[in-house]
Amino acid sequence: MGILAGVLTSLIGTAVGLIAGYKGGAVSEVLMRIVDVFLAIPSLAFTIVIASMLPKMTVTSTILVIGALNWMWMARSVRSQTLSESRRDYVDAAKALGMSDMEIMFKEILPNIIPVITANMVMVITQAMLTEASLSFLGIGDPSAISWGKMLSTAFDSGAIIYDCLLYTSRCV
């Protein structure tokens, strides 16, 4: 579940960052102000509020909520790398060849920023797993799904009598 939410987060953040970094100007300003607004709100609290408003938390809705609310840091780092790459000579050569903006972004710039995306994706997946465990621990996650947060909640509710579950699960998280 955390991996899928991390992949969704990475896709949204990469798309927003690529567009903001390549287009620049007013487009970049508007997108980055939206990112700033989302970053001003604590992500776990915002996730809890959105998740509690849904009628039923399923695995799909958990993935969508986590993925849709954690893309901002990825967008910022992709934008900064895209700004750097968009000023290189190969981008000017692609423009001279008549490539469209979408082709330049996805065929020329994106392959060169894959290392940044990969490094950020590792952090995003970790954050998504911790967010999902937090939601499950608080009882907001999918009740039918088995998760580390639910295991910790069960051990905690039993007064930590099941210390093996509490100890090993908390170490894994």
Task: Describe these PLM feature segments.
Residues 168-173:
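Conserved small/polar residues in nucleotide/adenosyl-binding loops
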Residues 84, 89-92, 103, 150:
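Residue-level preference for short helical/loop micro-motifs built around acidic side chains
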Residues 38, 107, 162-163:
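Hydrophobic alpha-helical transmembrane segments of integral membrane proteins
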